[in-house]
């Protein structure tokens, strides 16, 4: 079926789906421009306003609208002159597409704003760096200029006279003393310091630690470093007495540190036998057993 018979038969009243007109390049370009304008990528031409207001839009299969209607809507495009190959690729629509796409591309705008924010932050850091260095230098100067300020003591300790060059210090019951106090006569008893529930009392060359109960069982007596027995070595650990609490063995009469004997100050036994004496007794028993066993074998 040729194009003349198809054009003659292409009327709304006498339309049959079997008769179709061949579409040309101009028809395809017109259709594409209409679709782009309908999607909002390019502005509508002035002649196309009645087409857009029509209730039934153009079909993508291109079978319901006559070519005469397209020519009336787009009279500026010459139908007799074929479009070049470059027009088929829609190169003439690229500038308008770019102009319409630039405002809607928010990703590029975000990248630009992020770069600007980073630049501002760098400028702020560079401007704040010399100020911080000057502030640190000022703090160092103030620390070097300020004298050492001692912490104020309690009113009960301020009334106690102390030696200016060699202040008194309280000893821990298990650690050797590092300082010495001014000598006091044996008859005088002076309260030196109060630490929580424990009171440190000095009696001549002895320092007594008393709890709140002030019972004799809770006292820890320590000897001052001025005593001759301070550097005396009696314990098997080969360390001096050094004011630490010790206990005497009932067998060999040697003084042993409570920490070396693994005895707590709150649980000191009345009778103590050191480990060496225990081992010697055990060896004697073993030797006696071996002797009696050998005698029995010899007699048998």
Swiss-Prot record:
Pfam families: PHD_5. A motif (Nuclear localization signal) lies at residues 110-127. It is found in: Nucleus; Nucleus, Nucleoplasm. GO terms for cellular component: nucleoplasm; nucleus. SUPFAM superfamilies: FYVE/PHD zinc finger. Residues 113-124 have a biased composition (Basic residues). A zinc finger (PHD-type) spans 232-280. Residues 241-248 are annotated as: Interaction with trimethylated histone H3 (H3K4). Residues 125-135 have a biased composition (Basic and acidic residues). Subject to proteasomal degradation. Stable when bound to chromatin. The soluble form is rapidly degraded. Induction: Expression levels are tightly regulated during the cell cycle. Strongly up-regulated during late G2 phase and M phase of the mitotic cell cycle. Down-regulated at the G1-S phase transition of the cell cycle. Keywords: Cell cycle, Cell division, Chromatin regulator, DNA condensation, Metal-binding, Mitosis, Nucleus, Zinc, Zinc-finger. GO terms for molecular function: chromatin binding; chromatin-protein adaptor activity; histone H3K9me2/3 reader activity; methylated histone binding; zinc ion binding. Residues 109-185 are annotated as: Disordered. GO terms for biological process: cell division; chromosome segregation; DNA damage response; mitotic cell cycle; mitotic chromosome condensation. Residues 172-185 have a biased composition (Polar residues). Its main location: nucleus. PANTHER family: HISTONE-LYSINE N-METHYLTRANSFERASE SET-26-RELATED, PHD FINGER PROTEIN 13. Modulates chromatin structure and DNA damage response by regulating key determinants of chromatin compaction and DNA damage response. Binds H3K4me3-containing chromatin and promotes DNA condensation by recruiting corepressors such as TRIM28 and H3K9 methyltransferase SETDB1. Required for normal chromosome condensation during the early stages of mitosis. Required for normal chromosome separation during mitosis. Increases both chromatin-associated levels and activity of H3K9 methyltransferases, such as SETDB1, thus enhancing H3K9 trimethylation. This is PHD finger protein 13. It comes from Homo sapiens. The gene is PHF13.
């Amino acid at each position: 079926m040729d194009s003349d018979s198809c054009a003659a038969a292409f009327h709304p009243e006498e339309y049959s789906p079997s008769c179709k007109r061949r579409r040309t390049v101009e028809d395809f370009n017109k259709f594409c421009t209409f679709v782009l304008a309908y999607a909002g990528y390019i502005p509508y031409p002035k002649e196309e306003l009645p087409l857009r207001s029509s209730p039934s839009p153009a079909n993508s299969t291109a079978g319901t609208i006559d070519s005469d209607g397209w020519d009336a809507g787009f009279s500026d495009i010459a139908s007799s002159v074929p479009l070049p190959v470059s027009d088929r690729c829609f190169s003439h629509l690229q500038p308008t597409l770019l102009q319409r796409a630039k405002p809607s591309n928010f990703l590029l705008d975000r990248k630009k704003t992020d770069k600007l924010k980073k630049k501002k932050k760098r400028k702020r850091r560079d401007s704040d760096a010399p100020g911080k260095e000057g502030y640190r230098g000022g703090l160092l100067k103030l620390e070097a200029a300020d004298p050492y300020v001692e912490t104020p003591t309690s009113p009960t300790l301020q009334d106690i006279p102390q030696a200016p060059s060699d202040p008194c210090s309280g000893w821990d019951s298990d650690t050797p003393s590092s300082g010495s106090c001014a000598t006091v006569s044996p008859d005088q008893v002076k309260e030196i310091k109060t630490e929580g529930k424990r009171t440190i009392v000095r009696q001549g060359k002895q320092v007594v630690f008393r709890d709140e109960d002030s019972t004799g069982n809770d006292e820890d007596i320590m000897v001052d470093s001025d005593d001759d027995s301070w550097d005396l070595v009696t314990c098997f650990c080969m360390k001096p007495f050094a004011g630490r609490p010790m206990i005497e063995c009932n067998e060999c009469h040697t003084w042993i540190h409570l920490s070396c004997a693994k005895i707590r100050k709150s649980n000191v036994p009345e009778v103590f036998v050191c480990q060496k004496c225990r081992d010697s007794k055990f060896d004697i028993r073993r030797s006696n057993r071996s002797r009696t066993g050998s005698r029995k074998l010899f007699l048998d």
